[in-house]
Each structure stands twice: as structure tokens, then as C-alpha cells.
Amino acid sequence: MCGCVHSTQDQALRLEGEPNPPAAPTSTLAPKNMPKSISISKQLASIKALRKGSDLEKAIATAALVFRNSSDPDGKLRKATAKNLLQTQFKNFAEGQETKARYKDLLSELDEHTENKLDFEDFMVLLLSVTIMSDLLQNIWSVKITQ
């Protein structure tokens, strides 16, 4: 896996190989000083390793960039921000879940999170949990995959 460094000259990302990638996403896809005004699609396009990346790789990279762009300088996401992201960036998956017990339990666990912040792993588990219980997932399963 590669880390990225922000180029102050042209506001682009360039990749540098790392023999031992960091365990925490401190330098995964976008550095802390990446201007928030740059769209996710432009940030993705600037990552050379993803130019020929698969749809799945780009999907995970997008989630990582959304997390990174929304996180505090310490690389953690406040729970209020996480809830806001569910409502604004993940609304089609979260829609209709508000009255379901599993969704309420998930948000309750988020409220009880002792640190009051989520790291990237916790954020991804949250997204996957909401996805699995989502009504939208049932629609996705019913999409024709052959002609």
C-alpha cells in the first residue's frame, strides 16, 4: 500500500512507496492538509495507483477520502460528524432505518463510544453495518447482472 504526500506546488497528490505502511490511516489517501474544497472525484483522480484501479478499490478509496476530509486533525471522526455523514453522504442506505431496532442500537452504540470519536476502522464497520441492514441492499441484490 502507498501513502500520499501533498504537493504544495500544484495541489496534486503524488504517491511514495512505503515498505511498511502505517497501521492507522494517518497518511492513507489524503493528507491532513488537503484543502477541503477539492472534490472527492478530483482527489481520487490525483492518486496514480487508482487510475487503473478496480471499482471496489475506488469505492474503498472514496470512503477513506470522505473519512479523511471529515476527520479532525488527529485523524478521528467526531460521532456527531459520523451521524451527519450517515444522513448526508449515506442517506440512501440509512433511509427507512430510523425506526428499526438494529439501526437504533447501532446509533446507541455510537453514542456510547467512550472516546466520542471514531477511527477509520470504526467508521468502516459503521458503514458496513448500515449497508447490511439497509433496504437499498435488497434492491441492489435484485439488479440484473447479465443481459
From Swiss-Prot:
Residues 25-34 have a biased composition (Polar residues). The keyword Signal does not apply. The keyword Coiled coil does not apply. Its main location: other. SMART domains: S_100. GO terms for molecular function: calcium ion binding; calcium-dependent protein binding; transition metal ion binding. Residues 14-34 are annotated as: Disordered. InterPro entries: EF-hand-dom_pair (IPR011992), EH_dom (IPR000261), S-100_dom (IPR034325), S100_Ca-bd_sub (IPR013787). GO terms for cellular component: cilium. It is found in: Cell projection, Cilium. It comes from the Eukaryota. Keywords: Cell projection, Cilium. SUPFAM superfamilies: EF-hand. 'Sentan' means 'tip' in Japanese. May be a component of the linker structure that bridges the ciliary membrane and peripheral singlet microtubules. This is Sentan.
